[in-house]
Structures are given as structure tokens and as C-alpha cells.
Amino acid sequence: MLPGVKVTPEIAGIRGVEAGVDCRSPAGHTAFSDVDGLIDLVERIASATGLPVGIKSAVGESGFWDDLSLRMARTGTGPDFVVVDGGEGGTGAAPLAFADHVALPFRWGFARVYRAFREQDLTEDVAFVGSGKLGLPENALAALAMGCDSVNVGRTAMFAIGCIQAQKCHTDRCPTGVATQSARLQRGLDPTLKSVRCARYMASLRFELLRLSRACGVEHPALVTLDQIELLQDRWESIPLRQVVGYEDGWGQVSSGDRGELVDMMAADSDPAPEATD
């Protein structure tokens, strides 16, 4: 449900609804129904805006991604970046059954997508973004090792500015003022204070990522390989992440040219530690 206060005249005109009135937003749409339609839509938007155009998706069956990567390899068209959202990602609006049981967890879902593009030799032409509880340094590090060019941070950044997971996002009645258009409730969020806390969180995340990568013997988190990350199993066993996600040697790693640039960049970065919090 899109609250009426968010349905501006511009949005109303685009969606064909009445301005200022709550608008139901069904999961279905008519923009496209297959891979060819998706690619056509992406290309039309890119042509009209001159900007990179990407797609975001939670992951279930693999057929769509196999088909998409094959069409992109054949035609040289398609999205410029792909955002893969793990099923464990946070939301305040999804039905409980969807939040708990729909879509694969990030590591399994992203691996399916990356493998499809890697088999078509497209991973240097498409940027990959990970999402889904990646605001923790160990999770972000694994995502980068799996082939992500960057990671999205949502839940943990919201915690930093006061989110208490009241699950009221879709009602416009967030009690802490984080996710609301209500002027009264917005007073619960002090930008002067919360902006500093969010900045400190981001600086700390970066600092911890760098510490983990240096513990692995490399200069930058993107240089950590899947063989350097193991997952603990029952009965005191562990398994390399590469084996879990089914990657071949070299998959997920940056190119030799990018590796050199990262090393040079980090050599020039003094990497100061984040300031201590109050």
C-alpha cells in the first residue's frame, strides 16, 4: 500500500490513480512478461535517459537467469547492473509468509545468478550488487569474495538512526520517525544526532572490512578469495565457501588490472580508524 500522502500529482499521473489517495501496489505488472520484454524495457529507459539501467531481484528458480544471460551474450543488450537481494533481507511491508519463506538466502541466490553470467563470460560487463544482511563486515566480505562489486546496506544503517523494527513501515506510523511522512512522528528523528551515528556506523563498517581483509593477507576486501573463507558445519567440520557456492577457480575475483589499481589505491590510503563514539 502506497500511502496517499506519497501519491503526488506526478506519481498519480504516471500510475493513473487519484492524487492524495492510498494506492494499492500489486505484485503483478504489465511492463514486461518475459526476458525479451525486460531487455526491451531496459534499453528503452537507457535510450531515454542516457544512464546505466539495472534490475533488482530476489532469486528463486534459475531458468530466468540462464535465459537472461544467454540473450545478453547474443545481443549485447540488457541491464548494466544486477542487484541480488537475499531472502533474509529486511522489510517492514511484506506478508509474513513471504518474508520468512520466499526467495533463497543471499549466498545461494547470488551464486546462481553469478554462475549464469560467468558461464556466458559477462561478469566483466555487468556490475553486481549484493543485498540482504550485508551490513555486517563478515557478510559483506563474503559477498565481495563471491563477485559483488558493491553491497547495499539498509537494516544496519537504519538501526544506527533509531529503527526499532516496529514493522510499521507500510502504515506511515513509524514510532521513531525513520520511515514516515508524518511531521509529528518525524520529530522523533534528530538529524543532527542521527547523521553522526550513521556516519560512524559506515566508517566502522569500512574499518572492520579492511581489518578482516588484512587478516587474510590482502590490501583490500575485494581481493579476498573464496578459499580464504570457510563455513562451520556440525560435528566440528568446516567447508570452503567456494565449494558451497560451486564456483570454479578464479570466479568471483577481480581482474588483474583492477587488482593492481586496488593495491595502488590502498597504498595511498592511510586508513584512519573511525572516531570513538560517545
Can you describe what each PLM-predicted range is?
Residues P3, P9, P52, P79, ...:
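Proline-rich intrinsically disordered, low-complexity coils
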Residues H29-Q186:
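Glycine-rich phosphate/ribose-binding loops and adjacent secondary-structure elements
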Residues M1-L2, V21-P26, S270-D278:
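Proteins with a high burden of low-complexity, intrinsically disordered sequence enriched in S/T/G/P/A and R
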Residues M1-I14, E18, D40-R44, A48, ...:
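Fe-S-dependent hydro-lyases/dehydratases of central metabolism
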Residues G4-S33, G92-R107, D190-K194:
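Glycine-rich tight-turn/loop motif centered on a GG-T
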Residues H101, R112-D125, G135-D278:
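Alpha/beta catalytic cores of nucleotide-metabolism and tRNA/nucleoside-modifying enzymes
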Residues G16-C23, A46, G60, T91, ...:
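A generic structural signal for ordered alpha-helices
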